[in-house]
Amino acid sequence: MEDTHMKFGYFDDANKEYVITSPKTPLPWINYLGSENFFSLISNTCGGYSFYKDAKLLRLTRYRYNNVPFDSNGHYYYIKEGDTIWNPGWMPAKTDLDAYECHHGMGYSTFRSSKNDLQAELTAFVPVGKNCEINQLTLTNNSKETKDFSVFSYVEFCFWNAVDDSTNFQRNLSLGEVEVEESTIYHKTEYRERRNHFAYYTVNSPVAGFDTSRDDFLGVYGSIEHPETVYAGISHNSVASGGAVIGSHHLKLTLKPGESKSLIFVLGYSENDPEDKWEAPGIIK
């Protein structure tokens, strides 16, 4: 039988997947999610972005094409157990993992990784007929002791027009608007002024904290590889008004030996009819 294994992965014909066995590919290896109006690009290290219909004019999340290193902005999950911080897709913390696989399939990508007997399985997909990306993160304690740890989600919102978002810096610093309600973060930049659409980022579990200010989350001297909030283990509950806007949930989990917990994160787009946008003069829905 022909050996289909290559240096960085192999084709799984039975499951119609390409399985990547190392996160350190020569360049980002990207899958395309979505089929109708909502689309996402996702790399083998969870880099990428989402958009609704038009990648230039209706971009939900930021992606910097000339970043150093490559592919260092995406939809990330930081797992903090004690002093160990890692990501299911390796980036951006780049902590050495005990196991790693990325399965790029037809309309979905699944990441399977582990560190210190804590296993993570992350599946990202865009459901047919829905304007959102769903990420299911399942965590399993494979050790013989109870594990206490935190999960921090992270996306950076784009101010919709991708070209203006990356060029008009002076204006962009004063635009950002968010609202936070329980486990849902709403990105409403210019919704009151001139737009009828907004983005939201939510999770199916109560949160211990949140952040919507990138500066507060990363810290003055932090970075996406080393966010000060994650290393401190405490969110700021920041509500951004201007500046760079992000969505970050902080969840605290306890798993007994052999126990699993699934978290469902939804990043979505919503649009209202202009006549249905206002509850009363000056009050938006």
Regions found by a protein language model. Name each.
Residues 1-285:
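Anionic coordination/interaction segments
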